[in-house]
Amino acid sequence: MQDIAPTSLLHELVAPLGFNAGQEHDIFHCMENNQSGKVFHASHWTLLRDREVLIFQKKDVADVVPQVHIEEKWLDDSFVIPRQKEIACIDADKVKGPLTIRRWNQGDKFVPLGMSGKKKVSDYMTDRKFTLFQKERQWVVCSGEDIVWLVNERSDHRYRVTENTRRVLLLSIKVKDGE
């Protein structure tokens, strides 16, 4: 079997997605020099060189905001706190006003469950090795100005269920269009 040149393989991969020859050269150069974090754009696709891999993401036509599903429960002896990161369990009496959902912003801080001090959301995502695409798609659920849940990741410690909690809110996300 004949060896395939890496540049030919890259061309077969990216050309059908709309990346041009100059971009192919830059992508290959980025791979050869082990440059992470580089982003390349075609008309309908974005390519990210992240650590040792190439990640492709189709550009969204519209940014669909997911719905927050809220279930309220009274805390009793039969209640078991869910351990899935897809469900946040928070103290309902600590919530101020309506819950809102939005994308995270630079400078956002929260207190990750189990920690005592505030942490920037950007630092949390870097520590967890989020890709640029994952960071761009990250949602937060807020009570007023406070982040109560970094969606599908971690709740805020200030809203945790304690021995004094009477009512809990179980939060989950209903996502459409593969977001």
Regions found by a protein language model. Give the residues of each.
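AMP-forming adenylation/ATP pyrophosphatase catalytic core
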Residues: M1-E179
